[in-house]
Amino acid sequence: MKCPFCGFEESKVVDSRSTDDNTTIRRRRECLKCNKRYTTYEKIEDFPILVIKKDLTRENFNKEKIINGLIIACQKRPISRKQIEEIAYDIEKTISNSMLTEIPSNEIGEMVMARLKELDEISYVRFASVYRQFKDIDTFLEEIKNLRT
């Protein structure tokens, strides 16, 4: 690491600790030439995940979109904001752990539906009706029938 004071390229780490959110490491360094101390930060490089939409356009993954969809589906149901945020976080983590740089939006929708199905059947049907674009009552009945089997 190049010293900001004298430009020498060798230093020693005097202190190292994680930041409060555990996403960054703060290091105190000492230049081996001029003995001055300075601080550096080390952070994991984030690679944006792109969502491939139905029309094949791409946009950055946005966890807030999942949260907003879940809030609407879970409205007036006994589901807390914390549960909704945990679902969104789990989906984001699953996608990140897959090491994919792009993911189709329908895969994200299926992940949301799988978690809602476990959590609350009413919220699941609400979400499915919008996500799968139900056209009539028969489609609702078919989804409910599938939910029961």
UniProtKB/Swiss-Prot annotation:
A UniProt-annotated Pfam family: Zn_ribbon_NrdR
Cofactor: Zn(2+)
PROSITE patterns the UniProt entry points to: ATP_CONE (PS51161)
One Gene Ontology term of the molecular function aspect: zinc ion binding
Zinc finger (unnamed): 3-34
Cofactor stoichiometry and binding remark: Binds 1 zinc ion.
Record key words, sorted: ATP-binding, DNA-binding, Metal-binding, Nucleotide-binding, Repressor, Transcription, Transcription regulation, Zinc, Zinc-finger
Top-rank taxon, per record: Bacteria
GO biological process: negative regulation of DNA-templated transcription
Residue ranges annotated for the ATP-cone domain, each copy included: 49-139
Protein task: Negatively regulates transcription of bacterial ribonucleotide reductase nrd genes and operons by binding to NrdR-boxes.
Family classification: Belongs to the NrdR family.
Protein name: Transcriptional repressor NrdR
Species classification: Bacteria, Bacillati, Bacillota, Clostridia, Eubacteriales
